[in-house]
Structure formats: structure tokens, C-alpha cells
Swiss-Prot record:
Sequence repeat copies, ranges: 155-157, 158-160, 161-163, 164-166, 167-169, 170-172
Protein name stated in the entry: Neurovirulence factor ICP34.5
UniProt remark on domains: The triplet repeats region may play a role in modulating virus egress.
Gene: RL1
Function: Inhibits the establishment of the immune response and of the integrated stress response (ISR) in the infected cell. Plays essential roles in viral nuclear egress to mediate capsid transit across the nuclear membrane. Facilitates nuclear egress cooperatively with host C1QBP and protein kinase C/PKC to induce lamin A/C phosphorylation and subsequent reorganization. In turn, lamina disassembles and nuclear egress occurs.
Amino acid sequence: MARRRRRHRGPRRPRPPGPTGAVPTAQSQVTSTPNSEPVVRSAPAAGGPPPSCSLLLRQWLHVPESASDDDDDDDWPDSPPPEPAPEARPTAAAPRPRSPPPGAGPGGGANPSHPPSRPFRLPPRLALRLRVTAEHLARLRLRRAGGEGAPKPPATPATPATPATPATPATPARVRFSPHVRVRHLVVWASAARLARRGSWARERADRARFRRRVAEAEAVIGPCLGPEARARALARGAGPANSV
């Protein structure tokens, strides 16, 4: 017979509170009857929960502090400081007193014990960049505003006006093209870079042409040796007495 596995139960749920207006305290006790809602019954005040309460109910009960316990916060070193009274708290309307600067004395004058603080200065490069940026932004604002107040170019000294003569016309002459045009054909040799730009078919065509040229040169040299006269001479040389068996 198989052993029945024991089912694990979680923590028990707390019981529902009593009727409205009745809260379990140290001076009350929750009792329940079968088939009825829990009833809160008052109990005499005591220093702790009644002994008949369960552990779960003791956690829910509120035990008021006794007047005999004099726990002072000064006994605990890690206790937070006590909150100030409402009158001592600074309000938003009341201005806070400003602390004097480190170089100032109690009366507002210079304190001889503290040396005077140096004025804050930017690095040279950062100051130059900020100045150039500010000038650029100012020019942009003037340009967007319509050019009002834009810096004007320096005025050139006035030159005396020369009277117009018939030899020098007032209007500039236009460009005129000659009716005689010469066309010169320039010969440009195809380089390796140009062949590479044209593609592989151009290189293959050049290789085929070079191969045909070399074959023609070889035929011009070897052709006479393969004719009938050359064959007859070769056979006569080979049939001599020195080569006979």
C-alpha cells in the first residue's frame, strides 16, 4: 500500500476582524462561536495580552506602553536627534541667515587669519573658445535680424573719375570667338589603368592579339623548314652511310 504523501500547508491566514467599531486591543479579547462571526469582548487592562490568546492574535494586539518605562533617547548612541519644536523650525517666509565668506571677519571686514581668495579665471583656451563662440552667435543674431548693425566693410579711398574717351568704351567688351577653328587630334596610349577600367574583355582581346602576332612570327621562322624541299634534304641526310644499320 502506497504511503500517502503529506500535503504541505502554508502559514495560517489571519482571522477576519470583528464588527465595525470593535478593534482588538490589549483591553479586548476576540472569541468566536461555532457558525457565528467573531465577537470582541472587553477584558480588564493588563501589562500584556491575555494568556488565552494565540500567537497570531498576540501579534495583532496593541499593548500600550506603561508609564513606569522611562526610556530616554540619550541612552542610545545611534538614536536620531530629537525633532525641533514647531517654533524653532525655519519657515519659507523667514530668510535664513547667511554665513559670512571664509575671508570675512566677524564684523564684515577682512579677516587677517584667512588670505584673500583669488578671483576665478578660466583657462586661456577655454576663454578664447567662449569669446569666439559669443562673437559668432552675435553675428548670427545680427544676420537673422536683417543685417541691422552688421559691421560694414572698410571704405576705400575715392578715386578721381576719369572722363570717358572714344578709345576706351564705357561698357566692357564681350568675349568674341574666332571663325577659324583648328582641331588637333591627340594620340593617347592606353595604359594599364585604362585597360583595368575598361574591364577584363579588353585585356583578353589584347592577349589574343599578342598571341596571334607571336604565332605569325614563329610561322615565318619555322615555315621554310617544314616545306617539301626541306623534308627531302632531311631524308637524304638521314639515309647516308653513317646512319645505315
